[in-house]
Amino acid sequence: MPVKIPDNLPAAEILSAENIFVMSETRAAHQDIRPMKVLILNLMPNKIETETQLLRLLGNTPLQVDVDLLRIHDKESRHTSLDHMNTFYRDFEDVRHKNYDGLIITGAPLGQLDFEEVTYWDHIREIIDWSQSHVTSVLFLCWAAHAGLYHLYGLKRELLKTKRSGVFVHSRSCDHHPLLRGFDEEFFAPHSRYAEIPVAQIHAHPALQVLAESDEAGAYLVLSRNSRNLFVIGHPEYQKSTLSDEYHRDLAAGINPEIPQNYFRNDDPAQPPVARWHSHGSLLVSNWLNYYVYQLTPYDLSDMSAITPWEASSKS
């Protein structure tokens, strides 16, 4: 939680420079403690597994979070019963009139298709467009990150020769950024995808900022300059066994996949995997909720015009 201090206290500038989260009395007066309302658009086939992964991360923060689950259509999912979907998920028509503090859009196993070939691409575009006026901050994961960067900023991805699967080391691309508070200079994150957007294209876009990247895996954390959209080109939510499950699933399907890099002990699939990203994943989601949802969102969600970018709010 933030440290509330008097307006114009000299310590404010010093603490901000040291990456300490402070909030002026003036800004605090416009906020009150209430649950953060977060919508999750779950595009993964195994809905329950993905729900659990994301709720685990959201539950590691000191903030109270109310979650709504959103589906892209009312058809039965391959790995999740229609009863589960009808009981726990909402359709877009149920929420389009609402505003939310945060939206998380998950990845999807669609990495080798052009976006326009995805049967529900028009629905994805509609929800992304809606989010820009109805949600304080949107977190896009993996495939959704590529989809968002394409739809909002026109950045095109390129197919890789082989699937990029494994746990890769990343480094911060900038210092003293709120989203990176508490991050080590180098940290690990899982990747599982068939495409990438060249990092040079993202760096060159004036509306985007690359916060973390990998020599092997490319851009990882990309933030829009208005602080409203965070693109996480990876899977910080993955549990320890997820890459192993994907690898053995592909083996069983006769795909002959590459062994996930830096994942199994001694790179041997017969040995257990080593999870090196859980603390980073928790910190990433905690920082997003704290600094880009709680810090920016209006108390009255009906007035989304009260949102101000972090750079402006941190000077208040």
Swiss-Prot record:
GO biological process, one term: L-methionine biosynthetic process from homoserine via O-succinyl-L-homoserine and cystathionine
InterPro entries per the UniProt record, alphabetical: Class_I_gatase-like (IPR029062), HST_MetA (IPR005697), MetA_family (IPR033752)
Main subcellular localisation: cytoplasm
Gene Ontology annotations for the cellular component aspect, listed alphabetically: cytoplasm
Keywords, alphabetical: Acyltransferase, Amino-acid biosynthesis, Cytoplasm, Methionine biosynthesis, Transferase
Compartments, record wording: Cytoplasm
Active site: C142, H235, E237
Site, as annotated: Important for substrate specificity: S192
Annotated site, Important for acyl-CoA specificity, chain positions: G111
Disulphide bridges, residue numbers: none
The reaction(s) this protein catalyses: L-homoserine + succinyl-CoA = O-succinyl-L-homoserine + CoA
UniProt: substrate binding residues: K163, S192, R249
Gene Ontology MF: a single term: homoserine O-succinyltransferase activity
Enzyme class: transferase
Pathway field: Amino-acid biosynthesis; L-methionine biosynthesis via de novo pathway; O-succinyl-L-homoserine from L-homoserine: step 1/1
EC number: 2.3.1.46
One Pfam family of this chain: HTS
Family, similarity comment: Belongs to the MetA family.
PANTHER family in the record: HOMOSERINE O-SUCCINYLTRANSFERASE
Function comment: Transfers a succinyl group from succinyl-CoA to L-homoserine, forming succinyl-L-homoserine.
NCBIfam families assigned: metA (TIGR01001)
Protein name: Homoserine O-succinyltransferase
Gene coding for it: metAS
